Amino acid sequence: MKILLLYPPYTSHIEEEKKGYFPPLGLAYIAAILRSHNHSVRIIDMNVETKNLEELEKICEKEQPDIVGISSTTITYNTCINILKRIKNVIPSAIRIVGGPHASILPQEFVDYSDFVVVGEGEYTMLELVKTLENGENPSNIEGLVFKKDGKTVETGPRPLITGLDNLPFPARDLLPMEAYNDNKGAILTSRGCPFNCIFCNSHLIFGKKFRARSPKNVVDEIEHLVKKYNVQVIRILDDMFTLNRKRVIEICDEILNRGLNIGWELTNGTRVDKVDKELLEKMHEAGCYRIYYGIESGSKKVLKMLRKDIKLDQVRRVVKWTKEIGIEVGGFFMIGGPGETIETLKETEKFIEELNLDYVHLSIATPYPRTDFWNWVLKNGRFVTNDYSKFEKEFVFETPDFPWEQRMKIFEYLHEKYCFNE
């Protein structure tokens, strides 16, 4: 079948350049597995290909895909719905399938605008669905779907998480404009799932809490593929919890060294300070690791407890010191304005950032994603000031009686201007 996969733009006005943007690996994984079964696949990443919705309509009219798949996030929800409506008008015969984080968490918000919603990991669900549609068979027995049938919503039940990640083909990067992504940098996912319990995270709602990892050989095979095919010199590891399995990290490092791969790599998505030690950091540095971001979140013990981070400030101090001494650049992720936050706790965070003297500081607006415990905390302790998903991550969408959203925003902007010049 002829399949078009879309990654919607994060902004309404698409920038000519998206420096620092990452390729949509989720769609590239799905494209790879579909193509391995002889389906014709095209990916359009609207963040870098500067395709507005009118251009997208023209592409759909010209190519007439049998299936259009869209990956959804919370902040692209409105755009996704708009695209689904337009596709229905332009090519009524096309089957519209939605997946991704937001669709997995709230499939009911898409079911009236699409033919199928894929819930959770999409590779095998999508493959099975495409085969079923091609053969004109009943999709009701495919796990991981939500759809309408005879006016009623059908939920086929959850699909088990993928255990053999090594069996997945490498992402179909050749279907993406790789030159648009960070020049000589490549992105990779080596594991899925995180067993921790942070109040703000929604990753476990899609990938589960069980840590599932690719083998060191498989990981380094992909790194070598990126080096040889795309002349990549820097690898950005996007895992939620890369250092959870210490033995595996060391084996990955040894594999890189044994193959003589002269590359740099970084933990772009962060890791935990309680899941590294000095010896491990030294090994990582030897194998080319030049930058690590740590999920620190706050300089307040009270806020860390509310966030359920289960880390101590002294741990942060010690690990940051080790990392810098070894010669690895250190970045810190901080979440501003979340549960338990006050003017005083934000002053503690500001003081802690100053003390740590990090190479990079990334501040994020505390965002209560649907179905997270943070979302439920807001319902109990405050109120949402908007139901417009497009404002999530860009401004505070909630407030509490003692801390209005405008005040949170003002403090965030002050801290961001002060510390985030080098992101």
Annotate each predicted stretch with a short phrase.
Residues 2-13, 146-149, 329, 344-423:
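C-terminal accessory regions of radical SAM enzymes
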Residues 3, 96, 142-143, 235, ...:
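Hydrophobic/aromatic residues located in beta-strands of well-ordered beta-sheets
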Residues 4, 9-16, 142, 146-190, ...:
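N-terminal [4Fe-4S]-dependent radical SAM core
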Residues 13-27:
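Glycine- and acidic-residue-enriched helix-capping/strand-helix junction motifs
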Residues 22, 166-333, 351:
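Radical SAM [4Fe-4S] cluster-binding motif and immediate context
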Residues 30-162, 365-367, 371:
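Glycine-rich beta-alpha loop elements in corrinoid/cobalamin-binding modules
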Residues 64-68, 232, 358:
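Proline-aspartate-enriched helix->loop->beta-strand connector
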Residues 109-126, 281-292, 348-363:
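Structural recognition of alpha->loop->beta junctions
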